[in-house]
Structures are given as structure tokens and as C-alpha cells.
Amino acid sequence: MLKSILLVGVGSFIGGVLRYALSVLMRGICGPGFPWGTLIVNLAGCFAFGVIFALFGKYGSTNSGWCLLLTTGVCGGFTTFSTFVHESMQMLQNGNPGGFVAYVATSLVAGFLLLALGYMIFK
């Protein structure tokens, strides 16, 4: 159990640092008007999770420490649902219902599709 906790912790650290770096980069490129960084990390994380889980299912074990490190750890630390909800709420509070709908719909629909695509390609 301790080994699993440490693997998730290390992976979460890596994923969190990557998420922060990409969010800062995207804010610098696109400006602060739309949370592109969070959208990109959530979609990329969904795809990566599907790929990783499929590859471990095909070539290894989805119960392995490496799978835990990469999925629950790195992908879990990389993606961020709480930030997604907070940014969505801010759009509503700032009078941007169109941005809210676009962001929520794109995140959910594309997230599910990309996870499934990653899984199907690499299984």
C-alpha cells in the first residue's frame, strides 16, 4: 500500500508540474480570455490515460505499479477537474454563458472521445 501511495504521489507531482507549465505557456500564447491551458491538459490527459491503460492491458498489467504511476499519478496530477469547474463558474459569473457552454461541452464530449480513441488505437 505504501508503495502505491508513493507511486501516485510521485506521478501527481510530475503531472502537476507539467499542467502548470502548459497552462502558463498557453496563457502567454493565447491570453487570459479563455482557459486554453486547462482545456488542453484535460483533453491530452484523457487521451494519454486511454493510451496508457490500453498498452498496459495489452502488454503488461493494468494493476502494475507503472500503470498506477502513469494513470492515477501523472494523468491525475496533469488533469484538473476542480480547476475546470472553477473556470466554468467564473465564465458564468463574468457574463459569458456562450464561453461556459462551449468550454463545458468541449471538455466533456472531446474528453470522452479522446479517451476512447486513445484506448482503441493502442489496445
Where are these regions (language model features)?
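Membrane-interface helix-loop junctions in multi-pass transporters/channels
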Residues: 1-123
